[in-house]
């Protein structure tokens, strides 16, 4: 379980998060949705300690995020940033192997190497495992970074816009993989996603943010309602039921 208590954050005197509190249940997929500037990525970065807390507290699996040893935290949760940059030239396999560092300390075992290959295969990257990351397309690079996070093999996965640069096929495959990790391996997955229909079809819980506040939290069927989405996005979104899922139609 992830507990966020009265968390606030500001940049240059401008509030980005304003007294946010929530409980994210253990297990399953929780999607964070909302318009640009809502504070979604900032919330995820505070949960993962990529940024320091200014006010409030965060705990993950009972661990105080602000006080827990970095290596212990890295064995508990893995984070995919929205923007990822490399300062050295690495192959896909080398990059994914970094995900094992919290476990191996830089001395990978046979088990570590097997986990690397398994993660590469999960993201359909085996044919390009020996290619340099800077030779890949944007979507292939995104999958390589996600494979690195997957190789970390933590109970909690925090993913900031994991569908960036992915085409329709790989977006669906990514969400199916995350669903499988939650259902078969008991992972707790928290992701920022802009496509409300992916959130609706694959999530157990949705957090809706706006103007630095958490404005709604509930199941997809609770959140995917016209009045509620209008409150979040300030546009009218028609809701259709398709194969048991609520789908938002907002482009017509």
Predicted regions and their residues:
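Helix-to-loop junction immediately C-terminal to a conserved catalytic motif
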Residues: 48
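Conserved ABC ATPase signature
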Residues: 132-136, 140
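The feature captures the beta-strand-to-loop junction immediately N-terminal to the Walker
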Residues: 33-35
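Conserved ABC transporter NBD signature motif
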Residues: 56-64, 73
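Conserved ABC ATPase "signature" region
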Residues: 97, 110-128, 158
């Amino acid at each position: 379980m992830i507990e966020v208590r009265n968390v606030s954050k500001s940049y240059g005197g401008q509030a980005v998060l304003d007294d946010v509190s929530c409980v994210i249940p253990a297990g399953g997929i929780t999607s964070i949705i909302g318009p640009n500037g809502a504070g979604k990525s900032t919330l995820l970065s505070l949960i993962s300690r990529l940024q320091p807390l200014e006010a409030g507290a965060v705990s993950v699996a009972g661990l105080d995020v602000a006080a827990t040893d970095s290596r212990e935290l890295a064995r508990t949760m893995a984070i995919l940033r929205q923007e990822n940059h490399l300062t050295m030239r690495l192959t896909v396999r080398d990059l994914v192997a970094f995900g094992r560092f919290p476990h191996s300390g830089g001395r990978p075992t046979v088990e570590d190497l097997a986990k690397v290959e398994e993660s590469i295969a999960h993201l359909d990257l085996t044919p390009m495992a020996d290619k340099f990351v800077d030779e890949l397309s944007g979507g292939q690079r995104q999958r390589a970074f996600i494979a690195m996070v997957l190789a970390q093999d933590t109970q909690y996965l925090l993913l900031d816009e994991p569908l960036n640069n992915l085409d329709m096929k790989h977006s669906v495959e990514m969400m199916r993989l995350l669903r499988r990790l939650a259902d078969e391996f008991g992972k707790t997955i928290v992701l920022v996603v802009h496509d409300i229909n992916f959130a609706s079809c694959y999530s157990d819980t949705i957090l809706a943010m706006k103007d630095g506040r958490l404005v709604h939290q509930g199941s997809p069927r609770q959140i995917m309602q016209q009045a509620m989405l209008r409150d979040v996005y300030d546009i009218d979104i028609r809701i259709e039921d398709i194969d048991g899922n609520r789908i938002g139609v907002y482009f017509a």
